[in-house]
């Protein structure tokens, strides 16, 4: 959105704050920010504009503390997670051509997501240092939550990763999974989403009204475990 919209939102914010007896920027509190957010008729633009303003104000010494992280998040309705059956997922995995470099990579990453419920972003960012080959564990700090997580390095996952490493492009990068054309860098999670979508379509799996990204493997595993009574 344009500069005029940003200025309008900022003007409304400062006018509202002034009605709350905050006469100076340093007087602005978390409660003021929350009240202004609730009063806004354009919360989406409000959030981004005011977050930027509060960060800028703190960086320039106009405010003693950066309060940008206290701008409330927009409450969104969460739909029902997409779930694919175990048979559908196994069909997709089995159909991957594992004789190619890209096939070995796709199989290993999707297997990690399907068996361990790892988010696609975490699977794509997996590093060699995350794997303990002796203890047979995968230890990461989840990108979305920042929470540490230790998962078992299942035999089939270990085998799939090793087969990919043997075919992996020569690179000193610490990330395991790379794009296969120079310049090498970690695989984007959007590429993994595309690979699963292609597999679903190629195998004739019904995706009507369903999401098709690799994150669906996480929700599918959770659903499968619940059915089996594993919590």
Model-flagged regions — what are they?
Residues 2-4, 27-28, 78-102, 106, ...:
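Intrinsic, low-complexity N-terminal interaction/targeting segments
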Residues 11, 51, 107-121, 223-227:
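Short pre-functional
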Residues 97-98, 151, 194-231:
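Short, basic (Lys/Arg/His-rich) helix/loop patches that form interaction surfaces
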């Amino acid at each position: 959105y344009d500069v005029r919209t940003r200025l309008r939102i900022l003007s409304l914010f400062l006018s509202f704050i002034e009605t709350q007896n905050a006469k100076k920027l340093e007087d602005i509190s978390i409660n003021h920010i929350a009240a202004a957010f609730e009063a806004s008729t354009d919360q989406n633009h409000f959030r981004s504009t005011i977050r930027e303003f509060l960060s800028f104000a703190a960086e320039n010494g106009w405010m003693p503390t950066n309060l940008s992280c206290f701008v409330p998040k927009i409450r969104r309705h969460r739909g029902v997670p997409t779930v694919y059956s175990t048979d559908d997922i196994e069909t997709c995995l089995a159909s991957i051509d594992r004789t190619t470099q890209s096939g070995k990579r796709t199989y290993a990453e999707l297997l990690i997501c399907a068996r361990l419920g790892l988010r696609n972003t975490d699977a794509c960012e997996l590093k060699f240092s995350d794997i303990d080959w002796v203890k047979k564990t995968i230890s990461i700090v989840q990108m979305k939550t920042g929470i540490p997580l230790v998962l078992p390095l299942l035999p089939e996952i270990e085998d799939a990763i090793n087969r990919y490493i043997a075919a992996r492009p020569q690179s000193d990068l610490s990330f395991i999974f790379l794009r296969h054309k120079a310049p090498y860098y970690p695989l984007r999670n959007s590429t993994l989403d595309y690979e699963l979508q292609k597999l679903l379509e190629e195998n004739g799996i019904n995706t009507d009204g369903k999401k098709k990204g690799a994150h669906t493997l996480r929700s599918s595993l959770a659903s499968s475990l619940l059915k089996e009574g594993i919590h």
